[in-house]
Amino acid sequence: MEQLGKKYEFTEETIEVSERTLHRIKAIRDFGYVKAGELGGFIEKEENLSHEGNCWVYNVAKVYGDAEVCGDAKVHGNAEISMRSDYIVFKNWWSSGRYFTWTRSNNMWKVGCFYGTGEELIQKAYKDSEISGREYERVVRYVESILADEKKRE
């Protein structure tokens, strides 16, 4: 895979959030739907937004602390992300290519217009197709294993 180097830089514009200084970002090359020169949202440090993939922080969205935006994730609007494990975004690689999200705070899944538990997601997916059911089940079980590992460490 070709390394394209940095994709954004900090501008002079800063804001203060939770006693942290966040910097407005600006794209320095084209990637995904972002064009060179486009202003983005605010991040505290480069570790908050990967230079790889098509991930981007838009508008007035804020990312800071231990949070990291990577892959093809997009943070929009007034979103404010400050912890690494607030939620996990996955991509449906087996059919539609759309993104879906698991949220830690309520242990719920959001896929298109579906919103529910992991078990409800698996049941719905198997009704759609054997492949979808199997793949969604795999992802749900992966998240469950992360949670089980965290409980062991407590």
Place the predicted regions along the sequence by residue.
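Glycine-rich hexapeptide-repeat left-handed beta-helix
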Residues: 71-145
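Extended, small-residue-rich solenoid/repeat segments and analogous flexible loops
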Residues: 1-60, 64
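Acidic/polar low-complexity scaffolding segments in large eukaryotic proteins
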Residues: 148, 152-154
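Short, compact, well-ordered microdomains
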Residues: 55-64, 135-147
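General "foldedness" signal
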Residues: 36-39, 56-57, 123-125, 135, ...
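A detector of tandem-repeat and repeat-rich interaction/domain scaffolds
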Residues: 50-84
